[in-house]
């Protein structure tokens, strides 16, 4: 008689573990959507290359079409998920390497898409307008790549920091790796934070304030870090210089390989990518403010200091960035373990649906100012208000400035 066949014990344990994690996180395999974004980009580029001339420009603008139209529509149809993992499940999710591999897999695919785009842009038959449109499409991917860099920037491992810089290289926004974890997380939802928008501040006023303010902050942070180690800013250990060097090497290589004709494309994708990321920054803390304690320091960051949303599709694309309150409460907590808080202020829709309204100030103010007003129970003295429009905003809600009444 043949000996009974036994299933390999190790293999069975792996299968059981995978089944267990699938039960904990029912979206486990749907998270592949985020690293699949560059693959969608590659498909858009292939469509541009091989499509008939009359529809080439539709493919050239494929990135914004997906980002601003298709994703918001699907997001609205699919709806929300406010479920939370338990404390025990959070530990299991945090220790599962599957999720970290997903985040990192975005980066090589991002570079394949970028190189493919540069090849298309370098062809003589690619018009200047198409170079700009392709730059916008790739800017959408490289802008969302900043979110990949964001997830990696909070890790303690040096390799993760390098990978974070690699995701930022196409946009040249490498100072984000320094400023976000050590600057923004310290000052979030305060008037001093260049990355927190103020009530009544348009995105076009916020953009220069956050871009240049965050750059200045990153330089100050890295200068102080090096000084504590007895080193100067112009040191090989300066992480800012390392990141900028990586970006310079990438762009120089692209120009050397594909020619100067790629410059309009490179500038466009960087500008659009940076702007896309900063629109999300604009949304995240709009008008919200941490209050000062009796000792003059700000209260700790709480769930009520970030705008949140549970729309499933946008969360799948952005590693649950919309569960922003838990991210600020636990900055090193990986995306798969982030929780929803009932007390956190809620956006009217997902980030993807809010991008276009954020670029139209009257529409944005109509959608959001009332929410800030209601969040603070009609006490706008607690809100983070844009100084230039403070009196106008208070008057809009039938309020007066107590500082003016008191002669301050």
UniProtKB/Swiss-Prot annotation:
Pathway: Hydrocarbon metabolism; alkane degradation. One of its GO terms (molecular function) is metal ion binding. GO terms for cellular component: plasma membrane. One of its GO terms (biological process) is alkane catabolic process. It is an enzyme of class 1 (oxidoreductase). Belongs to the fatty acid desaturase type 1 family. AlkB subfamily. This is Alkane 1-monooxygenase. It comes from Acinetobacter baylyi (strain ATCC 33305 / BD413 / ADP1). The lineage of its organism: Bacteria, Pseudomonadati, Pseudomonadota, Gammaproteobacteria, Moraxellales.
């Amino acid at each position: 008689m043949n000996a009974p066949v036994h299933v390999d014990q190790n293999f069975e344990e792996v299968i059981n573990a995978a089944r267990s994690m699938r039960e904990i996180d029912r979206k486990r395999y749907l998270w592949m959507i985020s690293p699949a974004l560059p693959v969608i980009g590659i498909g858009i580029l292939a469509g541009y290359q091989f499509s008939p001339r009359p529809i080439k420009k539709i493919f050239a603008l494929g990135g914004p079409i997906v980002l601003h139209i298709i994703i918001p529509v699907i997001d609205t149809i699919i709806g929300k998920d406010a479920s939370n993992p338990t404390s025990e499940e959070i530990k299991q999710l945090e220790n599962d390497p599957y999720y970290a591999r997903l985040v990192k897999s975005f980066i090589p695919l991002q570079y394949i898409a970028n190189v493919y785009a540069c090849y298309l842009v370098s062809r003589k038959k690619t018009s200047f307008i198409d170079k700009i449109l392709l730059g916008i499409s790739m800017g959408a991917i490289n802008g969302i790549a900043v979110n990949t860099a964001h997830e990696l920037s909070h890790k303690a491992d040096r390799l993760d920091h390098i990978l974070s810089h690699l995701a930022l290289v196409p946009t040249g926004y490498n100072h984000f790796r320094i400023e976000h974890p050590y600057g923004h997380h310290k000052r979030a939802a305060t008037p001093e934070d260049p990355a927190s928008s103020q009530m009544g501040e348009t995105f076009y006023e916020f953009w220069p304030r956050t871009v240049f303010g965050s750059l200045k902050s990153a330089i100050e942070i890295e200068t102080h870090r090096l000084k504590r180690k007895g080193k100067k800013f112009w040191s090989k250990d300066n992480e800012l210089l390392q990141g900028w060097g990586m970006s310079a090497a990438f762009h120089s290589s692209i120009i050397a390989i594909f020619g100067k004709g790629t410059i309009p494309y490179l500038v466009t994708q960087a500008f659009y990518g940076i702007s896309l990321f900063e629109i999300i920054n604009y949304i995240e803390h709009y008008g919200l403010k941490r209050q000062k304690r009796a000792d003059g320091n700000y209260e700790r960051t709480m769930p009520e200091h970030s705008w949140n949303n549970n729309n499933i599709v946008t969360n799948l694309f952005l590693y649950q960035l919309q569960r922003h309150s838990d991210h600020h409460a636990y900055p090193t907590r990986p995306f798969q373990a982030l929780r929803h808080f009932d007390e956190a202020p809620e956006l009217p829709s997902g980030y993807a649906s809010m991008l276009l309204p954020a670029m139209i100030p009257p529409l944005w103010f109509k959608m959001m100012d009332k929410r800030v007003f209601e969040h603070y129970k009609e006490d706008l003295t607690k809100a983070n208000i844009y100084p230039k429009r403070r009196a106008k905003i208070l008057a809009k809600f039938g309020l007066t400035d107590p500082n003016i009444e008191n002669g301050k």
